Amino acid sequence: LLISTRFLRKVAINRRNYFRKRKENNKFRGIIMKNYEINSRTLAIVPVGENLTNVLEEDNEFMINMNSMKIIEKSCEFFGSSYMGRRTGTKVLTGISHKSPIIIEESTNMIYFPTTSPRLIGCIWIALDKIKEYKEVNGKILVFFKNRRKIFINISYGSFDNQYLRATKLEYILRSRKKLEN
């Protein structure tokens, strides 16, 4: 992967601006954590450059010194599986093989979906069950979470809607299987 100097400068400037905004808004207090496992309060995993991630929770916001894909992988492992195992499970259940939604934890239907290819540095992961609604605003998506938090995502409406529907399909299949078991 060839990364230009211009791109790296842009990432550094974005990081500085990001931290400045967070300090002004008083949501981010400057603490950077080394590890994080996705939990029932996690709303979104938002990368800030290559090895730094902003995690939005219902009541908190954390900076993690780890890329977003690593957080997803570690969270899958924390709940007893690997990312590749979860991805294969999604493919078997739904037939989806690219930009797959992932079941982080099955008993509580903790499902996350990527906004782009998970291999890309800028891939954001969103918790399906935390979304209240989403709409297009000036070519971007504004996601409203159930707890009234919101986030802008630089993605087309069609692409976001497709990812949301894929995750919903996975959730429906999981719920249907659980009903058959009972």
Describe the residue ranges of each PLM region.
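Eukaryotic intrinsically disordered, low-complexity regulatory linkers and tails enriched in Ser/Thr/Pro
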Residues: 3-126, 132-182
